[in-house]
Amino acid sequence: MQQRRPVRRALLSVSDKAGIVEFAQALSARGVELLSTGGTARLLAEKGLPVTEVSDYTGFPEMMDGRVKTLHPKVHGGILGRRGQDDAIMEEHQIQPIDMVVVNLYPFAQTVAREGCSLEDAVENIDIGGPTMVRSAAKNHKDVAIVVKSSDYDAIIKEMDANEGSLTLATRFDLAIKAFEHTAAYDSMIANYFGSMVPAYHGESKEAAGRFPRTLNLNFIKKQDMRYGENSHQQAAFYIEENVKEASVATATQVQGKALSYNNIADTDAALECVKEFAEPACVIVKHANPCGVAIGNSILDAYDRAYKTDPTSAFGGIIAFNRELDAETAQAIISRQFVEVIIAPSASEEALQITAAKQNVRVLTCGQWAERVPGLDFKRVNGGLLVQDRDLGMVGAEELRVVTKRQPTEQELRDALFCWKVAKFVKSNAIVYAKNNMTIGIGAGQMSRVYSAKIAGIKAADEGLEVKGSSMASDAFFPFRDGIDAAAAAGVTCVIQPGGSIRDDEVIAAADEHGIAMLFTDMRHFRH
């Protein structure tokens, strides 16, 4: 049963005025009476629309600098009144039914994100009347349509035209869900903001704020259901943040191929975040969340050729990320050479897409160009809890490194050291990366002892016939013993970059000096678990 309800009277009060004039014009043209408040009412009147100010409708003026506008029985009675049940009381108090409420809320998130935002500014951008109307209309969705997203305007008009000016219960219910999601997210932002403020729970502390709120409220929107999770017996879905400010797998557009799997998304994220570290044309190949080949080159084709050489065996069925547009020549090289699950790049040429289309199972994603990294939070679920930390956006430049050995690195060793240090940040701990001439030549990932990661990196290089002599090695954390340096020297490494900080640093440095290895300390660790 559709349970249509005609829309005869609508109340419009929005902070984000995108599309509101056109929507109001469409409603008015269909005979809908318009009520409005403040700036929205002035805008509609300026556009020549017949609009009644809420203060005129209620007979009660806006007051307290706009803090009190819609908190009135004639407004909320009109929204909450149940058709066929509350008609008599509404008539007794001259309350007219309001069939549609169009509201979006004060821009609290944008306000508190501004540099120098004061507590007073934040407080004045806490909407009171808006959420109250939204919740009232959503509660009474049986009779009232609540609209909180401008993206719904066109669909609402189309449905009204198809139903003689009415909306169905199914649509009103769907709009109500969006409304409750909207107010929940809004209240969560406010709670998170106040929860991280002094003196909310820091007692007499003079610190400006705590980094993390007392109660962490998170809101994510389901982007897609998945066939299954990490394994076929696990159900899964992909949720994304509403306003992501950085190019990411969450915001990427899939332009080709079958649906992404759970593991595809996780691996694509790892590949994309790694390739973002490089300014030069770069390619990152990932398998099971670990880079198995990374290189920079004169072009993305050159970078791909060099990245692939690191470990062609592991590259099979991998994820490939670029930081430049995917061109036809590179696409052809990939398709001719290997099986690939996903290719992600800022963009893809039409010619490249024609080539990859020949392989229906190849998923191609475009994510747009990216600017600087955006600070945010990383989460790790544990049974019964959630670990929260800042994103690891740390990186060192040449000027921040400390040479701790007798020998200084050559210019090429230094370039390779900085290159493999960027890669090591994205390799599972314990992470060891060998690099030479701006390409990885061996990667040791995820071993329980650092020396075995160093040995594996050397074995990988030897298996592919890659020359290790003269290469640089990066370690994501300090060496607890000299054995990792001995293993690297045996393979041919001549420069090591690592955080330092071990109680045996002197022994490790002495080992490097014995082997004639230049060693650089970053004073920054990049564990990845």
UniProtKB/Swiss-Prot annotation:
Gene Ontology, cellular component aspect: cytosol
A Pfam family that the UniProt record links to this protein: AICARFT_IMPCHas
Pathway note: Purine metabolism; IMP biosynthesis via de novo pathway; 5-formamido-1-(5-phospho-D-ribosyl)imidazole-4-carboxamide from 5-amino-1-(5-phospho-D-ribosyl)imidazole-4-carboxamide (10-formyl THF route): step 1/1; Purine metabolism; IMP biosynthesis via de novo pathway; IMP from 5-formamido-1-(5-phospho-D-ribosyl)imidazole-4-carboxamide: step 1/1
Molecular function GO labels: IMP cyclohydrolase activity; phosphoribosylaminoimidazolecarboxamide formyltransferase activity
Any one of the GO BP annotations: 'de novo' IMP biosynthetic process
EC number: 2.1.2.3, 3.5.4.10
Residues modified as N6-acetyllysine: 287
Chemical reaction(s) catalysed: (6R)-10-formyltetrahydrofolate + 5-amino-1-(5-phospho-beta-D-ribosyl)imidazole-4-carboxamide = 5-formamido-1-(5-phospho-D-ribosyl)imidazole-4-carboxamide + (6S)-5,6,7,8-tetrahydrofolate; IMP + H2O = 5-formamido-1-(5-phospho-D-ribosyl)imidazole-4-carboxamide
Record-annotated MGS-like domain positions: 1-148
Keyword set, alphabetical order: Acetylation, Hydrolase, Multifunctional enzyme, Purine biosynthesis, Transferase
Keyword Hydrolase: yes
Domain writeup: The IMP cyclohydrolase activity resides in the N-terminal region.
Family: Belongs to the PurH family.
Name of this chain's protein: Bifunctional purine biosynthesis protein PurH
Gene from which this protein is expressed: purH
